[in-house]
Amino acid sequence: MGARGNSFPRPSSTPCALHAPNAPAKPAVMRVIGLAGWSGAGKTTLLARLIPTLNARGIAVSTVKHAHHAFDIDTPGKDSHTHRQAGARQVMVASSQRWALMSELRGAPEPALSDLLARMDPVDLVIVEGFKRDAHPKVEVHRAANNKPWLHPDDPAIRAAATDTPPPGALPFAALGEVEAIADLILAHAAPWPS
């Protein structure tokens, strides 16, 4: 392409993690489920235990985390931060260990969960932490010591619970410490995406 082209040829013999020649086959269907619960219920702790449990079953897992506050994964003074501060819409940082793409909204609306999922590589299962107002199926993480009300009576998208006390009603549940049982609930209630 000429100087105004929007793509650059890449030698096909150059393997990289983005286009690995021996990459596992894409799953036939990507499935999505969320973890919903009050702060302090243990969503992140549970997720950190679920991921290796699901991976051990041969299930490729990715996650989406909603942040309620402004956040920055970059470091002031680093080149990538300087690029963003100068007005770059997106900045990609890559190394031999990982790569990350940062997109600046610059006043645009926060992206919907469906828009974020569309940008992810296909995997077997995406577990969403947050986005509790979205309609994707969820497992409620509830801890009695938090003294917070249950979410499932007001959210029909909650299909099961991971809890230290039985939920009211007929909601299927597993004990918070029973990670294998919670993994079973997640797999039973995850929905295909796009639906």
Question: Model segments located where?
Answer:
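Conserved lysine of the Walker
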Residues: K43
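N-terminal phosphate/diphosphate-binding loop that engages ATP/GTP or pyrophosphate donors
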Residues: R49-P111
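C-terminal accessory "lid"/substrate-recognition subdomains
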Residues: A56, D124, A175-S195
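Phosphate-binding/switch loop-helix module in NTP-utilizing enzymes
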Residues: E104-R133
